[in-house]
Amino acid sequence: ACLARGETCKDDCECCDCDNQCYCPFDWFGGKWHPVGCSCAYTNKYVCDHKKEKCKKA
């Protein structure tokens, strides 16, 4: 089972397809940057290749 675009994730490898990465936008809050949560988002071929390496099943 993998996560579709827009679903909440913790890691790139959880997101379906190679052009789907776990993206964490940041919000300004009280003078500090903090993550507002990560979700699977469309990405480019560079990340695609990186993800293939990183996410190979052991």
Curated annotation (Swiss-Prot):
Q: In which tissues is it expressed?
A: Expressed by the venom gland.
What main location does UniProt list?
A: secreted
| Keyword line | Disulfide bond, Knottin, Secreted
Origin superkingdom: Eukaryota
Q: Which cysteine pairs are covalently linked by disulfides here?
A: C2-C16, C9-C22, C15-C40, C24-C38, C48-C55
Signal peptide residues on this chain, from the entry's feature table:
none
Statement: the UniProt record of this protein carries the keyword Secreted: yes
Show the GO cellular component annotation of the record: extracellular region
Q: What is this protein for, i.e. what is its function? A: Non-toxic to mice.
Report the family membership: Belongs to the neurotoxin 09 (Tx3-6) family.
- Name listed for the protein in its UniProt record: U11-ctenitoxin-Pn1b
Q: Which organism is it from?
A: Phoneutria nigriventer (Brazilian armed spider)
Q: Lineage of the native species?
A: Eukaryota, Metazoa, Ecdysozoa, Arthropoda, Chelicerata
